[in-house]
């Protein structure tokens, strides 16, 4: 007998993250942001570096988390990804103390270039030739 695939709890890949995935991702984002703000890491590459956690996406089984990170005012986040990968076990341990889940997710860091792109677009919009076109009255 075939089971009903439309029942709640069974999700296809095209529907997007579940409410549980979103809730766990947001909780994880808050915990990571707090750790990055309050912890001095032993890794010399991360000494004095301020990391911003922009977004966290959870896998459907909640065992993997993709963490999108950036640095405010800097575009060199790619060079810190290996150091973030090295401290991932420490971060998992710290997160595990307060996370009420069966498994603490594996952390996979990715650069978040959205802020860099927004800054670039803002600079383009404030160029003199663009400002001239924006301030020119309509001639129809």
Curated annotation (Swiss-Prot):
InterPro entries: KH_dom-like_a/b, RbfA, RbfA_dom_sf, Ribosome-bd_factorA_CS. Transmembrane segments: none annotated. Belongs to the RbfA family. Residues 1-23 are annotated as: Disordered. PANTHER family: RIBOSOME-BINDING FACTOR A, CHLOROPLASTIC-RELATED. GO terms for cellular component: cytosol. PROSITE patterns: RBFA. One of its GO terms (biological process) is maturation of SSU-rRNA. One of several proteins that assist in the late maturation steps of the functional core of the 30S ribosomal subunit. Associates with free 30S ribosomal subunits (but not with 30S subunits that are part of 70S ribosomes or polysomes). Required for efficient processing of 16S rRNA. May interact with the 5'-terminal helix region of 16S rRNA. SUPFAM superfamilies: Ribosome-binding factor A, RbfA (SSF89919). One of its GO terms (molecular function) is ribosomal small subunit binding. The gene is rbfA. It comes from Acidiphilium cryptum (strain JF-5). Keywords: Cytoplasm, Ribosome biogenesis. It comes from the Bacteria. This is Ribosome-binding factor A. Monomer. Binds 30S ribosomal subunits, but not 50S ribosomal subunits or 70S ribosomes. Signal peptide: none annotated. Its main location: cytoplasm. It is found in: Cytoplasm.
């Amino acid at each position: 007998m075939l089971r009903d695939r439309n029942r709640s709890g069974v999700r296809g890949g095209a529907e997007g993250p579940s409410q549980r995935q979103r809730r766990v991702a947001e909780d994880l984002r808050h915990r990571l942001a707090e750790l990055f703000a309050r912890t001095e890491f032993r890794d010399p590459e991360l000494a004095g570096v301020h990391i911003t956690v922009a977004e966290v996406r959870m896998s459907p089984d909640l065992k993997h988390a993709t963490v999108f990170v950036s640095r405010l005012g800097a575009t060199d986040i790619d060079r810190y990804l290996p150091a973030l990968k090295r401290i991932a076990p420490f971060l998992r341990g710290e997160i595990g103390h307060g996370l009420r889940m069966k498994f603490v997710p594996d952390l996979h860091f990715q650069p978040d270039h959205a802020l860099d792109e927004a800054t670039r677009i803002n600079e383009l919009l404030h160029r003199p030739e663009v400002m001239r076109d924006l301030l020119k009255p309509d001639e129809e």
